[in-house]
Amino acid sequence: MKVNNIIKLMSFAAVAFIATACSDTDAQYTIPEVGAPEFVAATPESDADLLFGEQTFTVTFDKNIGFATKNASQITLNGVPVKSALVLGASPSLTITADVDFSKTQTLVIPAGLILGPQGDAYDQEIKLTWTLDDLPSNTAVAMTQKLGWGWNLGNHFDTSGDAISQGWGYWDRATPGAELFNSLAKAGAKTVRIPTTWTDHMNDNSVISADYLNEVAGVVDAAIAAGLNVILNTHHDSFETDLGNAANPEKKDVAKADSALICTLWTQVANKFKSYGEQLIFETFNEVHAGDNWSGGTAEQYDMLNKWNQYAVDAIRATGGNNATRWIGVSGYAANLDLTLNNLVLPTDPANRIMVAVHCYDPYGFCLAPVGADGTETYSSWGHNADPAYSVPDANEEYVIKLLYKLRKKYIEQGIPCYLGEYGCVVHTTDNANAFRKYYLEFFCRAAYMAGIPMLVWDNNSVSCGTVNGNECSSYFDHSTGAFVADGAEVVPMMIKACTSTDSSYWFDTIWSKSPTVK
């Protein structure tokens, strides 16, 4: 190889000398590159997280290279031939497209002799590149994930918002939650219950919350804690929840002032009521704050105002002292939307450094919350790699779910900031086949959350029709009074708990993938 290269260099030098001597111009000559290329680098870099799905790799050398595309099948990722490999124009880089599987370690192998230099000299070494997903770190965020585990929402029991109809507590579920319910939850394997609560409808003209109402809420909190459950208590559908657009309008400063004052006085009263409660109680500043009917996103001014509201709430809670000085507090971004929270939430300043991030995720929306169309038939009846393209949400399969939740891991969990899914779920569908896909989705989604280190609380609205008349809004797992399983809760709840808590390393995505139903 070396002798051949020396001969080439001598021949080239002679030709160059003759050409220069015979020329009567000032023309410049480019000396062509010779010799075999040398490997320089690859992207993604070795510390990158390669998640399931299609991935592009770029392998770069020290000079322009040649590659016969017919040899692409000899390049493998985890032993499987890549989808494509080519050099784009005159370039020192080989671009490879391959499917990343569920393995924690990905190994890309380019056999020796496939990469050629400008003069046909081959790179004579095998290139072997590996990427390994790190295990979850040992930090405060992961410890909180283990503490919260799998959880459940009391739905709209204390939700008194809505139209002009007088809605007292329990209007939506007509239940009396107590020891029987919470003991059943604990026995099933739940660790946390979220109690969504509307407060402003129980205030007098001086913004004082009814003592009877405070006691009623406290009684339910007490029953849950007595059963050994953690409790997340929030503000839910209060008067300011959809008023963000007005509060952020610079021409409506009076609205901003009034809403801010209301938030402070509300949280001061709630925090004082529970200031002696221990670590099992967690506060959550807001539910899904947004502007009017705009759920898809707001303006920079609205995001800024919501960040201020979170700070006001945290300050009000901390100022009450007692155990509230160090109590964990959950905060969320616009509409509690995952991406909007990631992109726009500014964590409040907190002397206790005990702030968690709360997000909600019902993705893909059509399959999870609104599968039934206006004609009563299912528009979205399947999900995942075996779904019917005509009856599923496009580009929202297993790959989408894994990457969606992993963003929370990178932004929060790996940085030691606890994060939880305050709401998730998928309504009971109207056909057996669609419900088979629903169960597959729930198991896969829960396992993806486990991989990301995210605890989760399923939404349960105690829809009495579940199991008989299913479809949109049918989200029931436990009877809100007795704690008995409803609909398919007895089957689905243990499955979800296992998926989001099991430490069995053999229980991985490929195990669930193989159980995917097919369209019938």
What is each stretch, according to the model?
Residues A261-D395, Y406-C426, M451-I454:
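Active-site region of glycoside hydrolase catalytic domains
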